[in-house]
Amino acid sequence: MELLLIRHALPLRIDEGAVDGPADPALSEVGHLQARALSDWLAAEHVDALWCSPMRRARETVAPVAERLQLEVRLEDGLAEFDREALSYIPIEELKAAGDPRWNEVPEQPEHFRRVVVEAVEGIVAAHAGHRVAVVCHGGVINAYAAHVLGIDDPLFFLPTYTSISRIFAASTGERSIASLNEAAHLRDL
């Protein structure tokens, strides 16, 4: 089976104190354009199923894909980002550009986060043998699963682009192989 792990589109910034409770931002205008470009790109692929993080930025990213492909979206709590309880959301690219050290923060209890992600993704793999499945999630989730496949400890070893696709093949023997990381050809014209 083939997994397409897709990072959500660009969300809005939410500063601490701007909302009651955890920050769960909607997509920005650019994010909606990215999500539409992704849906156009995936229309040329044969996708059999759609899975998604329950977080708003992921759900809004997958919505045009589901509409275009006429597929139902399944939510999986184990695909939520490690910052799901944060009181603010600042896009990591903004943090990095500003020299803010938070851009490279790893999740609290990275081993636990990785276990949750791997269990969720492997559950999707088990449910879809022989199929191509698109999974809209988060940069931390993609890093955690890719690091698991590669056998590395670094919980955040690369920065997936918004709506980028990382392809992983999952054999019925349990073997996993990464075909690509961070495909973003669908964003060329944005």
Language-model segments: residues:
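Short beta-strand scaffold positions
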Residues: 52-53, 115, 136-137
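Acidic, low-complexity terminal tails and accessory targeting/binding regions
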Residues: 71-75, 81-93, 126-131, 147-190
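Active-site signature of alpha/beta-hydrolase-fold catalytic machinery across serine-
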Residues: 64, 144-148
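Short glycine/proline- and acidic residue-enriched helix-loop micro-motifs
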Residues: 94-112
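Active-site-proximal alpha-helix that buttresses catalytic centers in soluble enzyme cores
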Residues: 3-69, 73
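Short active-site segment of divalent metal-dependent hydrolases/proteases
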Residues: 11, 141-142
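Generic beta-sheet signal
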Residues: 3, 131-139
